[in-house]
Structures are given as structure tokens and as C-alpha cells.
């Protein structure tokens, strides 16, 4: 009997000691969590977003300002969008050209930051349609607009153990290439309403996805009209435009060009023009055009099938 009582006392003492040990461990864990911060999935963390802008603000047009849009994408869904003008005077004074664009507050997780900069007079006067940065488009027939634009994309992971905040840099690049077509024209063949008609061969990109850095929509064999042929020194500018380009790629452009007068006749013609385009590059292409004369017939041999109708 005494032996049983002794065993019971020892067992009870060990249980009490074990319980004290468990309580001590729980207290240590609690203190550690209090020091480190308990993870809260709904807690937001500050992210400072800078823009690497380089020569972004070397712009001759003082009537427009760079306007920035930043889109926050999570699981292929836009969860935030911010738009604002960038003060160029302050931006020029930034060292290393890292301009503080904005601060975000985001829960922990994985994101993509998409950014777009174009030039506007007011918030509601863009040349580009930018409601969705996965499909940026150009407006048609908008004269006098500054078509330069810049894009940036950055994968971003917010860690819950970084409560102080993170700093990230958006490196902007140009998603556009531009070209100018020039030619020699006879003064006697010109009038005030000369029009260039360009027929593109193949696909012409019309929408750009900032996330993938690629063109996502195209027109097949479109025809574009450019009014107001201008003289520059001893050459005439037939057409000048900019196009979306896949990031880091070189693309070829093929087209035919006709120049018409105010009477509706075709005065000059170049059936096939080819040149290469590269993002952030401007190409000037001089075009030799055949003079159709008063009769609107090309001087020289005509090839191809001709249908003759006799009444």
C-alpha cells in the first residue's frame, strides 16, 4: 500500500512539472510572436514605387505633360489602378533619374505592376486608350497629339515579414517604333489637298499588352489615309506615323503608297515599299514614286491582268 502511494505521488509530481514545462514553452512562443508580429492575411504593407525615367522628359512640346498610369495585377485581375501627372521640373532634378511615382499599400502576395506613360494636356485628352493596360490602343484621326509613350512591367512579391516596406523600380522602355516616308515631287503636280494613301501588306499591330510586352491585336491589310503632304527642305513628307512593337524584336513593314490630288486622281504611285522597324527607333525612308501624269497612267510597262469593257 505504501508503495502504491509513493508511485502516485511521484506520478502526480511529474505531471505537474510537465504542465509547468508546457506553460513555460507556450509563454516563450507567445513572447516570440509578440516580438515578431502575428501574421495577419489582411494586413497591408507599404511599397514605394520609383520610375527609372532616363530621357523621358526631353520633350519639345510644352503644352503637354507626362501622365502615368500604374495598374496592380493579382491572379490576372486588376486590383488597383492609379493615374497622375508627373511634374517634369521636379523629375529633372532627381538624381540617377529614379523618380518616386507613388506609394502602394498591398496585402502580402504575388503581383505584377504594369505602368504606362504618355503625354496629355488634360487627364481626359489622351492619344492612347489606356483603360486596360493589357490592351492599349491608339485613337484614330487625332491630329496634333504627342504620340510618344513608355511602358514598364515588374513582378512583385510582398512578404509578411517585411513590415517596414519595400522599394521597387519600374524601368520604362518605348513600345513604339516610328517612321517617316519622304519622296521627290514635281511642283506643278501639287495642290493644297494632296493625300497619301498607304496600303499595308500583312498585319498591322493596333493593341499592346504591357504585361507580356507584345502586340495582341492586328488589322489585316489595312489602308490608311494621310492628309496634308508637307515640304521639308528639298523633300516632301508623304506620311509619318508610329506603331506598336514587340519588346526586343525587329519587324518588317511592307506597303504600297499612292498620292492623290484634290480632284480625286492618283498622281504618284509606289506599289511596293519595305523596311524594318525596331522599338524606340525612328526610320526615315526615301521613296521613289512613279509619276502618273495628267492621264493617271504609269509611264512605262504595265504588268498584270487588265479588264477592258466596250459599251
Predicted regions and their residues:
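Structural motif
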Residues: 51-64, 182-191
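Structured interaction patches on ligand/partner-binding surfaces of diverse proteins
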Residues: 89-91, 121-167, 263-293
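Conserved "repeat-terminator" motif of extracellular CCP/Sushi domains
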Residues: 40-41, 169-176, 244-246
Amino acid at each position: 500500500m505504501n508503495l502504491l502511494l509513493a508511485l502516485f505521488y511521484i506520478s502526480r509530481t511529474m505531471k505537474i512539472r510537465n504542465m509547468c514545462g508546457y506553460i513555460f514553452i507556450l509563454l516563450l512562443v507567445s513572447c516570440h510572436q509578440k516580438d515578431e508580429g502575428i501574421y495577419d492575411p489582411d494586413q497591408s504593407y507599404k511599397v514605394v514605387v520609383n520610375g527609372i525615367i532616363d530621357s523621358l522628359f526631353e520633350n519639345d512640346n510644352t503644352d503637354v505633360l507626362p501622365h502615368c498610369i500604374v495598374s496592380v495585377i493579382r491572379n490576372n485581375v486588376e486590383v488597383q489602378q492609379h493615374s497622375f501627372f508627373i511634374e517634369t521640373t521636379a523629375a529633372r532634378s532627381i538624381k540617377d533619374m529614379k523618380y518616386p511615382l507613388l506609394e502602394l499599400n498591398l496585402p502580402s502576395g504575388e503581383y505584377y505592376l504594369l505602368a504606362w506613360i504618355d503625354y496629355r494636356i488634360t487627364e481626359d485628352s489622351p492619344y492612347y486608350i489606356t483603360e486596360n493596360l493589357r490592351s492599349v490602343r491608339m485613337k484614330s484621326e487625332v491630329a496634333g497629339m504627342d504620340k510618344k509613350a513608355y511602358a514598364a512591367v515588374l513582378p512583385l512579391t510582398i512578404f509578411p515579414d517585411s513590415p517596414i516596406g519595400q522599394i521597387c523600380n519600374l524601368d520604362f522602355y518605348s513600345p513604339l517604333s516610328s517612321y517617316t516616308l519622304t519622296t521627290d515631287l514635281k511642283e506643278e503636280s501639287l495642290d493644297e489637298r494632296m493625300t497619301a494613301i498607304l496600303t499595308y501588306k500583312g498585319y498591322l499591330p493596333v493593341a499592346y499588352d504591357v504585361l507580356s510586352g507584345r502586340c495582341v491585336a492586328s488589322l489585316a491589310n489595312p489602308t490608311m489615309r494621310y492628309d496634308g503632304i508637307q515640304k521639308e527642305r528639298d523633300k516632301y513628307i508623304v506620311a509619318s506615323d508610329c506603331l506598336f512593337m514587340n519588346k526586343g524584336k525587329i519587324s518588317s513593314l511592307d506597303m504600297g503608297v499612292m498620292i492623290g490630288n484634290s480632284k480625286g486622281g492618283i498622281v504618284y504611285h509606289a506599289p511596293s515599299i519595305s523596311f524594318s522597324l525596331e522599338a524606340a527607333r525612328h526610320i526615315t525612308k526615301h521613296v521613289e514614286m512613279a509619276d502618273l501624269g495628267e492621264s493617271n497612267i504609269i509611264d512605262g510597262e504595265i504588268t498584270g491582268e487588265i479588264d477592258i469593257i466596250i459599251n
